[in-house]
Amino acid sequence: MTILDEATCWDLLSTAAVSRLAVVVGDDLEIFPINTVVDGRTIVFSTGEGTKLAAVTIARNVVVEADGHDDATGEAWSVVVKGEADRLDRFDDIDKAEQLPLRSWSTHPKQWFVRVKPRSITGRRFAVSAG
């Protein structure tokens, strides 16, 4: 296993097709799949009304995780970002977010943007077992 430096973590995170968002909802932890885009040293995703939006608005501490693998090299990676989520509500912030190359897998309407400002980012690369 190799511990990744911050620059490599951001590079890998920018290639992830889907990430996972972990939030506290009441007394429970919830994990949601999200499509993300790296914007500078932040992560942006879009969402519709519902539990995910309510959770990041009330309890802004979140964890974003993404991973991937390379069949050619037999290696996999995982990046974890711990940070604070901000729902974008200023018109110029929303306008900038709408210009980002954020592609959603879902056809569900997603009219809100959220930016995660990291407190920490860590990553690992490791060999995938043959079994």
Per-segment meaning from a language model:
Residues 45-46, 64, 123:
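Short hydrophobic/aromatic-rich beta-strand segments that constitute the beta-sheet cores
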